[in-house]
């Protein structure tokens, strides 16, 4: 008899019959099991049937996926994928509209299954669907429901990657683009059309060019002004895709009307006021809360917008380029006025002009006084720093002149070098905003203030250069303190950004509250446990308390594992998310896990989790790139965000249970809890943070009675013995 691990107990349903309770031997061929099931109901031709899940997306069971069947799973006996595909193909071309509609509903549902999709595509199903859409103006006006299911089925089939998107015809593209550009279209059709266009753009450069001929930016903007946030989300996702695929030469010109632009010029349009204001007013400042997927798309849009700066950031200045040198001359002219130009002074010679230029460039704060162009040869920030300086000088001229003249009038040792500061600040902002990096799949931390201005980066630079100048004065800094000042400014900016101000003015106010003295106060408060508790008695007390605190943290981690967590299965973003749950037995001896229909809101019982792993069988915990599921999936492996949340349990005999935590907090909880189960140290960032917090709190509580009392570094000396003990009184 096979070992119990090869036997799975399931229930199998068939319409109009009592369910069969069956023990499936996973070593038997699937065809043999299906024949046994058919014999139980006296069904002929078992080759016409297969098994599929009764719950969730109702996926087919194949030889490749049969090991995913868990104890207690409910299965259905169903028509085989090839037979189902053939039947649906016939029904989709029926003369009866009711039959065709029912067929399309079923097709849209089954197309999410890769086994069925393969069979249907092999029967030229994609071609049939595209022809239905291409001839679909009549369908649109009278049978929008059928068209919506047709587009859903098409998108699901194409998402499997079985066939190339390049096989799509121009007629089909025109039809889909027509649904997007028409003013009154059914919401379901519009949603699927936007999703199809997004996939086309992302998967084929040639299709991008064809779509560009059919849609204008203005047509996409109209979908951002609707009240349906799902439509807005799909519209921004398409905008992001177009932006990402825009040719480099289309990303530079910022002087065109965005509404009339074809989508080949999508990257230009993002710098235009109309598009930005529509997103700001109808999406970010709308009356509805921003959902997770919308927040992600806004984050992607923000990243791609800032990435337009990458070319300038990585461009070195050419000291021999007169046009570039003229920008530096312009900075000098604006700061010191044209009257001081040595070329206007009668009889001024070349040497005299050079001397005056050198003096002015020194006052402007450049490192290379003779040839300041050399200051811009380092990348990053390259020419982007010069762009920022010129923007400040022209748009905020009073601020620029005040900063330059204020510093040039100080003593040499206390002047804040504007040129050097601007270059380093630009580099710092690029690092903080991660200019040039691709968006992460799991992030959604967009900043509303960056959508409030067409030149958000330049405006941010203007605010931060004033902050730098203010902080320099507060620190009474000299040239030797330059790096210290930059560290403080970085801290001020990174402390202000997480508050997500709604406008640049709010950001400026937040920075104003984070003065140098406030930063010192915050640093002192954060270092309190390190700076205030370093005397030997306090260190000894901390060492005595620490094991108790670690035990407390360990119990909390194990309790959280006993409560359990739900983990998302990686899949297509558009498809309904699937979850599975894992929790530790109350006796800490077994891990229970199993699939879920959806994300649970309450407690998941042990009885509903069919699988289990004895803790004694766990050999190791691996994380990140060492996880088997990170090695297998190249797309996931490249996603840094997912990689940082991945971990796997290795257990006997050579099996793995793979996790991707929903967030960093859950990741730390599970890594700590599993490490504690195996008797290893808990080394996560969360444990270090909790240990510091709890230790600090416990120390403060125990030292309350010693407030304002100086604790000596060494114990007091033992006094000498008294000369006599006559003072002792004996009762009696």
Swiss-Prot record:
Please give a single GO biological process term from the UniProt record.
phagocytosis
* Top-rank taxon: Eukaryota
Pfam families per the UniProt record, alphabetical: ELMO_ARM, ELMO_CED12, PH_12
In chain numbering, motif SH3-binding lies across: 712-719
Instruction: Name the predominant localization.
Output: cytoplasm
What compartments host this protein? Cytoplasm; Cytoplasm, Cytosol; Membrane
Family annotation (CDD domains): PH_ELMO1_CED-12 (cd13359)
Which residues are modified to Phosphoserine?
515
- Keyword Transmembrane helix: yes or no? no
* GO CC annotation terms, alphabetical: cytosol; membrane
Q: Which UniProt keywords apply?
A: Apoptosis, Cytoplasm, Membrane, Phagocytosis, Phosphoprotein, SH3-binding
Annotated GO molecular function terms are: receptor tyrosine kinase binding; SH3 domain binding
User: Per the database record, which ranges form the ELMO domain?
Assistant: 323-497
Subunit annotation: Interacts directly with the SH3-domain of DOCK1 via its SH3-binding site. Probably forms a heterotrimeric complex with DOCK1 and RAC1. Interacts with ARHGEF16, DOCK4 and EPHA2; mediates activation of RAC1 by EPHA2. Interacts with ADGRB3. Interacts with AUTS2; the interaction is direct.
Its recorded name reads: Engulfment and cell motility protein 2
- Taxonomic source organism: Mus musculus
């Amino acid at each position: 008899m096979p070992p119990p691990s090869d036997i799975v107990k399931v229930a199998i349903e068939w319409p109009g019959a009592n369910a069969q309770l069956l023990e499936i031997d996973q070593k038997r061929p699937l065809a043999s099991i299906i024949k046994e099931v058919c014999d139980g109901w006296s069904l002929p031709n078992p080759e016409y049937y297969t098994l599929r899940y009764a719950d969730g997306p109702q996926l087919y069971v194949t030889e490749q996926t049969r090991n995913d069947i868990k104890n207690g799973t409910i299965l259905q006996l169903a028509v085989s994928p090839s037979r189902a595909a053939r039947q649906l193909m016939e029904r989709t071309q029926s003369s009866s509209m009711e039959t065709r509609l029912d067929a399309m509903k079923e097709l849209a549902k089954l197309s999410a299954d890769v086994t069925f999709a393969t069979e249907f595509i092999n029967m030229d199903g994609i071609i049939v669907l595209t022809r239905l859409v291409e001839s679909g103006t009549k369908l649109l006006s009278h049978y929008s429901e059928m068209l919506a299911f047709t587009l859903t089925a098409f998108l699901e089939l194409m998402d499997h990657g079985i066939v190339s998107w390049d096989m799509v015809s121009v007629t089909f593209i025109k039809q889909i683009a027509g649904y997007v550009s028409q003013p009154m279209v059914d919401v379901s059709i519009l949603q699927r059309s936007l999703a199809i266009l997004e996939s086309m753009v992302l998967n084929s450069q040639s299709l991008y060019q064809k779509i560009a001929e059919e849609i204008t930016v203005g047509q996409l903007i109209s979908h951002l002004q609707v009240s349906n946030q799902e439509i807005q989300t799909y519209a921004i996702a398409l905008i992001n895709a177009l932006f990402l695929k825009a040719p480099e030469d289309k990303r530079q010109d910022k002087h065109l009307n965005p509404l009339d632009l074809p989508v080949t010029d999508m990257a230009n349009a993002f710098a235009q006021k109309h598009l930005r204001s529509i997103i700001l007013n109808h999406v970010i400042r709308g009356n509805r809360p921003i959902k997770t997927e919308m927040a992600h798309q806004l984050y992607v849009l923000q990243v791609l917008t800032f990435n337009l700066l990458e070319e300038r950031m990585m461009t070195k200045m050419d000291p021999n380029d007169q046009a570039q040198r003229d920008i530096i001359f312009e900075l000098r002219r604006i700061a010191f006025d044209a009257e001081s130009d040595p070329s206007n002074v009668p009889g001024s010679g070349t040497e005299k002009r050079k001397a005056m230029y050198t003096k002015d460039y020194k006052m402007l704060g450049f490192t290379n006084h003779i040839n300041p162009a050399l200051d811009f040869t380092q990348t990053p920030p390259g020419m982007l720093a010069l762009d920022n300086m010129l923007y400040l000088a022209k748009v905020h001229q009073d601020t620029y002149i005040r900063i330059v003249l204020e510093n040039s009038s100080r003593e040499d040792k206390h002047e804040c070098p504007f040129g050097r500061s601007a270059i380093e600040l630009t580099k710092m902002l690029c690092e903080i905003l991660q200019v040039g990096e691709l968006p992460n799949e799991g992030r959604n931390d967009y900043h509303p203030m960056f959508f409030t201005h067409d030149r958000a980066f330049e405006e941010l630079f203007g605010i931060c250069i004033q902050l730098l100048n203010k902080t320099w004065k507060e620190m009474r800094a000299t040239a030797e303190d330059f790096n210290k000042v930059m560290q403080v400014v970085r801290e001020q900016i990174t402390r202000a950004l997480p508050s997500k101000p709604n406008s640049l003015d709010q950001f400026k106010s937040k920075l104003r509250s984070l003065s140098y003295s406030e930063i010192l106060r915050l640093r002192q408060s954060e270092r309190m446990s390190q700076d205030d508790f370093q005397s030997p008695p306090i260190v000894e007390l901390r060492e005595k308390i620490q094991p108790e605190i670690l035990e407390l943290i360990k119990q909390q981690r194990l309790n959280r594992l006993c409560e359990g967590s739900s983990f998302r299965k990686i899949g297509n973003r558009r498809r309904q998310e699937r979850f599975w749950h894992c929790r530790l037995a109350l006796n800490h001896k077994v891990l229970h896990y199993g699939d879920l229909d959806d994300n649970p809101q309450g407690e998941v019982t042990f009885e509903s989790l069919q699988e289990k792993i004895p803790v004694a069988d766990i050999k190791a915990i691996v994380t990140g790139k060492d996880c088997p599921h990170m090695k297998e999936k190249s797309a996931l492996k490249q996603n840094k965000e997912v990689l940082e949340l991945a971990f796997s349990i290795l257990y006997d005999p050579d099996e793995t249970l793979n996790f991707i935590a929903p967030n960093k907090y859950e990741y730390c909880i599970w890594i700590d809890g599993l490490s504690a189960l195996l008797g290893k140290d808990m080394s996560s960032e969360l444990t270090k943070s909790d240990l510091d917090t709890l230790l600090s709190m416990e120390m403060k509580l125990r030292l309350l009675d010693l407030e304002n009392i100086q604790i000596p570094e060494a114990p007091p000396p033992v006094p000498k013995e008294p000369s006599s003990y006559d003072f002792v009184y004996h009762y009696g």
